[in-house]
Amino acid sequence: MLSKLLRVGEGRMVKRLKKVADYVESLSGDVEKLTDAELRAKTDEFKKRHAEGESLDELLPEAFAVAREAAWRVLGQRPFEVQLMGAAALHLGNVAEMKTGEGKTLTSVLPAYLNGIGGKGVHIVTVNDYLAKRDSEWMGRVHRFLGLDVGVILAQMTPEERRVAYNADITYGTNNEFGFDYLRDNMAHTLDDCVQRGHNFVIVDEVDSILIDEARTPLIISGPADGSSNWYTEFARLAPLMEKDTHYEVDLRKRTVGVHELGVEFVEDQLGIDNLYEAANSPLVSYLNNALKAKELFNRDKDYIVRNGEVLIVDEFTGRVLIGRRYSEGMHQAIEAKEHVEIKAENQTLATITLQNYFRLYNKHAGMTGTAQTEAAELHEIYKLGVVPIPTNRPMVREDQSDLIYKTEEAKYIAVVDDVAERYEKGQPVLIGTTSVERSEYLSRQFTKRRIPHNVLNAKYHEQEAGIIAEAGRRGAITVATNMAGRGTDIVLGGNVDFLTDKRLRDNGLDPVETPDEYEQAWHQELPKVKEEAGDEATEVIKAGGLYVLGTERHESRRIDNQLRGRSGRQGDPGESRFYLSLGDELMRRFNGAALESLLTRLNLPDDVPIEAKMVTRAIKSAQTQVEQQNFEVRKNVLKYDEVMNQQRKVIYAERRRILEGENLQQQVKDMLTDVITAYVDGATVEGYAEDWDLDALWTALKTLYPVGIKTDTLMRRDQDSDRDDLTRDELLQALLQDADQAYAAREAELEELAGEGAMRQLERNVLLNVIDRKWREHLYEMDYLKEGIGLRAMAQRDPLVEYQREGYDMFMAMLDGVKEESVGFLFNVSVEAVPAPQVEVAPVAEPEDLAEFATAAAAAAQEGGAGRKNAAAREEAPSRLRAKGIEDESPALTYSGPSEDGSAQVQRNGGGAAKTPAGVPAGRSRRERREAARRQGRGAKPPKSVKKR
């Protein structure tokens, strides 16, 4: 119903966009007369007018006309009317639904240019690093021609390179990189370590893939945790000995395993324990479940491959190998044990955010995709994004044939090879979509037997993917691809002219970024030649029927199927598509497979005779709808629970930023001191009468906090006639607060004598940042475990979400109290030493070559102390700086966990990080042990009970 309501205003929006496009078109005549220099000068004119109060909406027609003309002069491509409509929809903060081949990448240039004029930055999000780099170079040529800076964020960049890219007018990158940089900035210890400059306007390419599919998996930065691989190895030995349906059951639909009583007894016998489920053995249950999942649900060459003794995840949707990424919660270690390769340690969470809440940080969102209408309700509900279907430039003439269903997979693949051989004979290009590396290699072997030349595009050979796709529309080209979602390169009949031209120029040593002038000159010379060659070949391909897309299996998402089909029939070209299915396909087995098999049995058809039945089509659609609905529920649930964490995250990150930006913390620390001592006094004076107070215990506790300078006797008997009853709670509190203030002033004088003026402010900054980070990390553990068990509250007729919100709030307030107490204790008791300041101007830190060196550089920068740029002068005045022992240790390498390109699995990528983790955090072998370790570490971080007198 909501989807229908959202579509009511589509017609009006399209008409409005058509008027904008017509107005831009009317300005083209005047813009075409401008010289290159005059066209470039328009950017400065727009910036000036915007600074004087003219809005971007008012500048839109002229800016679009200028950017359109620049695209024609630089790329030889003039955006069509429908692309102008799409560009306007993006600027207005909508999702532009543009079919494959309609030029979404070129469309994004116009709103990016317009919003780049504002000077607050534009982020363009793509699905992978290759496309981010390609688009920043390709479309960046237009922006650079017009005088705007263009940057790109890639996985292996150093912090300095990232900062330069973010300071550009327009920045390209992937959602994971943008999100991780946000988290790293909120783990930084100086402003110099921060790279982002705010969240103004974002354009998301393949918006449904990024904001819908990948939204199921949060971004997580984690640090190394101690752990033993013995249990993984032991359970990898037991899993093959256990029998399915006897010892355990498997639910393929929900991707879960359940251990039967016989299975529990078997494991207990093998391990020599009495009760698997008693408290001491409960961590073993997780090892058992992961071992069985690794055996039944994770298949080699489909879900992962093993290369050079390492388990590498294969993206289910796109078929790419996700280098360096890992499953979480011990799943990757279980697979490593199954495959008998080195088992690497688990990690502990340091920072996390969901994609939904990251993209909500932006003032304005927009997105592009070919398949968003089915998700319009979700995009509107979560991101407040409207979906606007943009008409195609030319009518679609592709023929979508009905599915062919075979009884066995073998019969299906024989039919596929026969069909492809027939198309190859007449010179028609064919694109075959498969769902796994294993299937693509099987088909490749069959084609080789039949002597059919072909290219394979899958997880093992993805380095060549752009080149293979660019030529997939040439005469007789046969391309086998694991999946086409997010590939990002157009399949043009006769060959992709832009790609082929670029390849020739790069082969001659030219580069659009390194040698822009020579590249542009050669481009205009080479482009007409390539166009002519490709045009002649395209004519032959059209006669043969255009591109034929053949799917070998239906995907669980209809959008992925539609994206595969959409590769054919772009820009009004002829084309054809068909799916070949069998009862052995994953989707068929998970839903309604038995009913279809009984139907085929009753029909008594031979294996090699397919059926085309509406009932089967309906069953497939029903299965896909069920999966999509399940995934939607998962995403909604993730968002509901993360909203609790999001509010807490905002408080912590805002506080960190305030500290980083150099605000004077002296008053805040004094307020903390007041709160902590007040809490101590309240706890000791809870009984109503002074004679009932245990002041000795209070003094013992206070001495762990600061060097107490008054004695209980002084307070109790101020003169010979006074009585203990004369001491009130307020008098006690005021006396202790006055004493603590004097002690803090003495501590400040001591440190300034040691390291010069401003030393105490520097220590306050360092201590607060480190304590906040430590307590936040511990809080993340606690919230994680609270969420794991909160579902059981439903058995007590309580709403788990409400309980999570209530208990999460209580835990957060307790954490803030802990931050105050630990900070005060550290400020009084931490051991410090003076470090000589450098005698010369501080040179820039050498840029590390890759993320593995990221942490070392970050830690070195963090040890500079201070509050960043605003306090640079203050740092220079101090003859030396302080180093606090125990809170400025070296940073460990970090691990990044986020969604793959489809969001189907939580994975991890190793690298360095910008924040420090206190050393000596014993993480434990199991999640329960890690939790206890976090608690112990939190307790152990409190100040020593004796204070060294000076």
Swiss-Prot record:
GO terms for molecular function: ATP binding; protein-exporting ATPase activity. This is Protein translocase subunit SecA 1. Monomer and homodimer. Part of the essential Sec protein translocation apparatus which comprises SecA, SecYEG and auxiliary proteins SecDF. Other proteins may also be involved. Its EC number is 7.4.2.8. It is a peripheral membrane protein. Part of the Sec protein translocase complex. Interacts with the SecYEG preprotein conducting channel. Has a central role in coupling the hydrolysis of ATP to the transfer of proteins into and across the cell membrane, serving as an ATP-driven molecular motor driving the stepwise translocation of polypeptide chains across the membrane. The keyword Cytoplasm applies. Signal peptide: none annotated. Belongs to the SecA family. One of its GO terms (cellular component) is cell envelope Sec protein transport complex. Residues 873-888 have a biased composition (Basic and acidic residues). InterPro entries: Helicase_ATP-bd, Helicase_C-like, P-loop_NTPase, SecA, SecA_CS, SecA_DEAD, SecA_motor_DEAD, SecA_preprotein_X-link_dom. Residues 864-950 are annotated as: Disordered. PROSITE patterns: SECA, SECA_MOTOR_DEAD. Its main location: membrane. Keywords: ATP-binding, Cell membrane, Cytoplasm, Membrane, Nucleotide-binding, Protein transport, Translocase, Translocation, Transport. It catalyses: ATP + H2O + cellular proteinSide 1 = ADP + phosphate + cellular proteinSide 2. The lineage of its organism: Bacteria, Bacillati, Actinomycetota, Actinomycetes, Mycobacteriales. It is an enzyme of class 7 (translocase). It is found in: Cell membrane; Cytoplasm. GO terms for biological process: intracellular protein transmembrane transport; protein import; protein targeting; protein transport by the Sec complex. ATP binds at residues 83, 101-105, 490. SUPFAM superfamilies: Helical scaffold and wing domains of SecA, P-loop containing nucleoside triphosphate hydrolases, Pre-protein crosslinking domain of SecA.
